[in-house]
Structures are given as C-alpha cells and as structure tokens.
C-alpha cells in the first residue's frame, strides 16, 4: 500500500489518501514537511465533517497550528496489553492478576515451552521497546526505527534511549528468553506472518489496547485474554494512528468535495458500513440484533480503525451495543503526555536521521527480538551506539533537544 500510495502521490493521481503517524514514507511526519498535504483549516469549520467529532480531536491533530489531517475517531490514545491464549490460561491455571510487568510472564513461558509450542512468546516480528516502555518515555517519533530518542517522563528532557538502564534491561530480558527457547528465530528473521496469531503455535503476544479488546477473539479466530502492561497515554501522534488527508495538488473545489465525502463517511452509517465491511449480502449481513455478521466467503478485509468513526460504524456481532460510548470513555481516561503537542521537524537533519534508522535495522531490531546472545548484549549496545554516532546521531539528538526545549518555552 505504501509504495502504491507514494507513487500515486508523486504522479498527482489522487486527492484523498489514508495514512497514519506510524506509516513510513507517506506518514504524517513525512507529508507535512514535503508540503504534500492540503491545509484544510479554513475549509473545516461549520462542515458536517468538523461537527462529526469533538473539537479536541481537531486540536490534537494539528501541525504548526493548522489542520492537514482528518483523524479516524477510534482509540485515539496509546496503551499496550499482553495477550494470552485462553486455552492455555485454562489448562495451566495461569493467574493473570500476578502479571504487572513483562518479566512476570516467565513462568508461563516455561509452561508454553514444555507444551512444545513454536512461539511461546510471539513478538510478531516487532521491536517493542518503544511500546512496552511508554510509561517511562514519550517516543514522539512513534516509529520503532527511531526509538533511539525520546522524552524521559521523569525529567521532561530529551534523552539518548540506547544509554538508559531501561533499554539494557529490555534487551537483556529478550536475550535471556531467546536462549531459553521462548522467542523463535522466526521473529528475528521476520519470517513469522501476520496470520501467525491465528494459529495455536503461540502462547503470549502483545496487543494494542482498545475499548473493546474482545475484538481480538474474532481477529485471531480463538479466545484470548488481555492484561494491561502499560498505562494509556495521549501523545502527539496517538490521535493520528489512522487518518486521511487531502493532497496538496488538489484544487479548492476538489478539497471541498473531499471534505463533503468524508462528512458523509463519518456520519452516514450505511456508507460507513459499506466502506468498512463491503457489500451487504456478499461480504456481510445484519443479524437479528442489527449487528454486523461477516460472511465466510467475504473478500473485503477492512477494519473500523482504518475506515470510519467508531461512533457510526455498526458494531460487529458479539461486540457491545454501546461501543460508541465505550470509545468516548476510553479516550477520556488516558494520561496526557508532557510532550503532547510537540512534533519534531527532521528536515534540518533528514539525511542523518535516515542513516540512524538504517543503523536501528542493523542492531536495534535484533537486540529487541532476542537476536543477540546474553553475553553479547552489552558489547552490541556499545557497537549500536558507536554506529549511530558515526551516522550523525549526536547531531540528530541535539536537534531534537533544541526543538523540544524551544517548544517547552
């Protein structure tokens, strides 16, 4: 999708685009500096689209005081859970109430290993430090490949994450688990797939916390249980985890047409259901309770979070009928980060920033997925830092610190 969308952008073939803060190449932090998106600030007020959500959503998604993006109203705060296959919870009588931090699941991983499972701890080929440790840091880049810089919540200062005790703690734990056989080499080599979670080959993985976590049962075709491993936080990027934008090549007439269409998508349940679930009678049906029942042969594969507002998309069968109010309560119950509202402009150090991201792929990903022996974690972290510095990291860090200090004033 990213490649196709980027090509269409370059060729000026499109007016409306879905993106997200975590997307690469076409992410929100890429498009604004490139002047690739339309400033819709003056076109929004008084429209059906603007009135479809509270003003706070529009404020939270501004860049430099201007609206460029149309947030999908969903779980617009950030938090993470550990996800357990319920079958194993029942079989081994795991007491999930004892799980307060990541290391607490170690006895359960031992059970999963004895079960003969291929993936006792499934990382889903994801470097997770920047998610598991959001109680300590605001990783305002919202990108694993640049998790080497963050705001320390205790000091409200930008820090070199690689040098923190927390980073070493996490890498040591992942190395230990890999050597115990709890993490598979498949995650390190990125050969696990997006459907591995639908199998019975794993025991414990991660999940992005949402108002209705029971959605995971249908997504993974099995019952799972969730335990929060972080608090929920409102970040600069959390409300942009799924959004739309109008391309800068659009005329004002085209931009207004896009806003009119999005107003319908965010307020008309029939259109929202069609865009989210496909064709009624072919991809889905409404059950006796008026909820969505997907068909077995349905070919449409969208989800609410990437489609339309949670307040208007019809809940799926088995979901709470009051899903809309659950989302409003969920978003309202989060902590607000000290760095909420800050957006880093990487333009002054773009080449060095990109070079540091490449270094992450060389060192950071393996460190965070158990791909480094326990005896070599310290030396690898040192080599990682050295390679970052050679790539220009200190200049990038200084630019982060300068921009953040200026923003705090």
Residue ranges with predicted function:
Residues 2, 6, 28, 37, ...:
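Extracytoplasmic/secreted envelope proteins and their assembly/folding machinery
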